[in-house]
Amino acid sequence: MQKKDRRKSFYRGIRSEKWAAWWLRLKGFRIVARRFKTKSGEIDLIARRGNLVLIVEVKARATLADAMVAVCRMNERRIEAAADIWLAQQKDYSALCVRFDFIAILPWRLPHHIQRFFESHQ
């Protein structure tokens, strides 16, 4: 991928995550982290409403099917590893209920939110 294309993809991802964050705020969630990065992985968005914590992967694609297949098992493991690190930093860790969700950003559509996109395998 050329530098120009990489930059374009990066900014497209930023815009998509902003749309997804807006969508979650409309549903009553508070965004507590964006692009949480660790050595083992990255989480696009972390949202919270009460004791429910959403670990959200965001993908912008032409179709929902394309967006869903863009997340493979290896991506899930990296997201889980990053989630473990973030959760360990929380004081109320034992009281939190964690859910792994997915938001697809599709052209000319509202964000498509899939709850429980995958389950933790640990």
From Swiss-Prot:
Q: Return the InterPro entries for the record.
A: Restrct_endonuc-II-like (IPR011335), tRNA_endonuc-like_dom_sf (IPR011856), UPF0102_YraN-like (IPR003509)
Q: Which GO terms describe its molecular function?
A: nucleic acid binding
Coiled coil start-end:
none
Q: Which family does it belong to?
A: Belongs to the UPF0102 family.
Task: Name it.
Answer: UPF0102 protein BARBAKC583_1042
The organism named in the record is: Bartonella bacilliformis (strain ATCC 35685 / KC583 / Herrer 020/F12,63)
